[in-house]
UniProtKB/Swiss-Prot annotation:
<dbReference type="Pfam" id="PF07448">
    <property type="entry name" value="Spp-24"/>
</dbReference>
<dbReference type="GO" id="GO:0005576">
    <property type="term" value="C:extracellular region"/>
</dbReference>
<dbReference type="GO" id="GO:0004866">
    <property type="term" value="F:endopeptidase inhibitor activity"/>
</dbReference>
<dbReference type="InterPro" id="IPR046350">
    <property type="entry name" value="Cystatin_sf"/>
</dbReference>
<keyword id="KW-0597">Phosphoprotein</keyword>
<feature type="disulfide bond">
    <location>
        <begin position="92"/>
        <end position="103"/>
    </location>
</feature>
<feature type="modified residue" description="Phosphoserine">
    <location>
        <position position="173"/>
    </location>
</feature>
<comment type="function">
    <text>Could coordinate an aspect of bone turnover.</text>
</comment>
<keyword id="KW-1015">Disulfide bond</keyword>
<feature type="modified residue" description="Phosphoserine">
    <location>
        <position position="145"/>
    </location>
</feature>
<dbReference type="GO" id="GO:0005788">
    <property type="term" value="C:endoplasmic reticulum lumen"/>
</dbReference>
<feature type="modified residue" description="Phosphoserine">
    <location>
        <position position="96"/>
    </location>
</feature>
<feature type="disulfide bond">
    <location>
        <begin position="116"/>
        <end position="134"/>
    </location>
</feature>
<dbReference type="GO" id="GO:0065003">
    <property type="term" value="P:protein-containing complex assembly"/>
</dbReference>
<dbReference type="GO" id="GO:0062023">
    <property type="term" value="C:collagen-containing extracellular matrix"/>
</dbReference>
<comment type="similarity">
    <text>Belongs to the SPP2 family.</text>
</comment>
<feature type="modified residue" description="Phosphoserine">
    <location>
        <position position="182"/>
    </location>
</feature>
Length: 211
């Protein structure tokens, strides 16, 4: 049986070896970067700003859950942060000039929610560049699934709206989808003799040119 004293001696040796090993790595050129926690907050804030600049939603998005996935140290003053965060539409409109962090979340059942990932370059404690991309969370998809099963093509896929909010589908394409879907519903619901199709020549066109 190993006595208590021997156990304590063994633990002390392990701790000393661990401390010496850490000291060896730091002295041998292993990158050590003690960044300010405010840099993480700035990186998240810059990521949300980037998402809002890319979104076509009239409302601002706000982060409500975030985590730091990885930190890549480039040198003493430069690093790259990989963040993952969830966003949700707020009650503040884009043209309000409000800080998204101060805006209340929308409480609508169909409020848009997404999971985003961003890569943020930080130099001398300042954000220098941000790349962000988002995908719609499973909870958002599930909230639509039951309605789609009940109403079918009357609701259609929710993906068109989600893609529109992040600029993946133009206004004109959305108009085409609504028009084609309405024709499909009329063909199934109305008898052949009672069908009255909208006049193609009088359909409004939406200007999709952006500055």
């Amino acid at each position: 049986m190993i006595s208590r004293m021997e156990k304590m001696t063994m633990m002390m040796k392990i701790l000393i070896m661990f401390a010496l090993g850490m000291n060896y790595w730091s002295c041998s050129g292993f990158p050590v970067y003690d960044y300010d926690p405010s840099s993480l907050r700035d990186a998240l804030s810059a990521s949300v700003v980037k998402v809002n600049s890319q979104s076509l939603s009239p409302y601002l998005f706000r982060a409500f859950r975030s985590s730091l996935k990885r930190v890549e140290v480039l040198d003493e003053n430069n690093l790259v942060m990989n963040l993952e965060f969830s966003i949700r539409e707020t009650t503040c409109r884009k043209d309000s000039g409000e800080d998204p962090a101060t805006c209340a979340f929308q409480r609508d059942y169909y409020v848009s929610t997404a999971v985003c990932r961003s890569t943020v370059k930080v130099s001398a404690q300042q954000v220098q560049g941000v790349h962000a991309r988002c995908s719609w969370s499973s909870s958002t998809s599930e909230s639509y699934s039951s309605e789609e099963m009940i109403f079918g093509d009357m609701l259609g896929s929710h993906k068109w709206r989600n893609n529109y909010l992040f600029g993946l589908i133009s206004d004109e394409s959305i108009s085409e989808q609504f028009y084609d879907r309405s024709l499909g519903i009329m063909r199934r619901v109305l008898p052949p003799g009672n069908r009255r199709y909208p006049n193609h020549r009088h359909r409004a066109r939406i200007n999709t040119d952006f500055e």
